[in-house]
Amino acid sequence: MSQRSVLITGCSSGIGYDAAHSLFKAGWRVFATCRKAEDVDRLTNEGLEALQLDVTDETSMDSALSEILSRTGGSLDALINNAAYATPGAAEDIPTEALREIFETNLFGLHALTRKVIPVMRKQGYGRIVNIGSVLGYVVFKWRAAYVATKYALEGYTDTLRLEMKDTPIKIILINPGPITSRIRQNSVPHFEKHINWSASPRAEQYRKSLLKRLYEDRGPDRYQLPASAVTKKLFVALDAKNPAPKMYVTTPAYTMNILRRVLPTRALDWLIQKG
């Protein structure tokens, strides 16, 4: 059996980083991609086959995919769309430009790369596309409007793509993690500082008491937080199972909220989320 190949986006840390190393150790030919050249160099020094890929840049995507296909002889078994970031802030304080920027990475870039990979998989007669969603793709929390909007959109996009791909040999899977050990909070700070003029907001006092503490103080792990390896375990199922579940959930909050959103009235769910 020939070595299976997988392209993973967003491998500099967190879920993508753990998945790249774990799949490599399991015998996959992993193409670990990052936006920054220094991260590519770091992963290369760690023994991974790393490439630079910016999902907001068509030329970057074309170049990386072309290089990958040249190395594999034109085949690619799997794509894991993981690259994403957050821009925290109250919805009324988020400039439209900030919303456009986050959609470019979290959805539009994912869509563009997926479109480039589907013809390869259709031609070879097999393939798996795994999108990394979030518990915030089906429930909401304050201060997360921009990220929530992209993940809700990804949920609908993935559902539609899955139905459309039913008549092809390409399987589409969505993994929705809850709180996972990663650098998403730290990585969100530059986006917050770039776009959110919190001190001029009518919610300035709420920012001081809540969001600023979350962003700038190390408050330790969330109560139900799991390591990135918990997501990787689901990725192995998504890639190896003959008929994997179309949606998978990671962490207790992800499972629980998926049930509660279906059974609770909106006001009751709002109350529960606010209380939590």
Q: Language-model segments: what does each one mean?
A:
Residues 167-219:
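C-terminal beta-strand-loop-alpha-helix "lid" module of Rossmann-like NAD(P)-dependent dehydrogenases
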Residues 90-91, 98-100:
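Substrate-binding pocket helix/loop in short-chain dehydrogenase/reductase
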Residues 12-13:
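Conserved glycine-rich cofactor-binding loop
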Residues 82-87:
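Conserved NAD(P)H cofactor-binding loop of Rossmann-fold oxidoreductase domains
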Residues 134:
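Residue(s) in the substrate-gating loop at a strand-loop-helix junction
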Residues 114, 150:
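Active-site helix of classical SDR
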Residues 53-63, 96-97:
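The beta1-alpha1 cofactor-binding region of Rossmann-like NAD(H)/NADP(H)-dependent oxidoreductases
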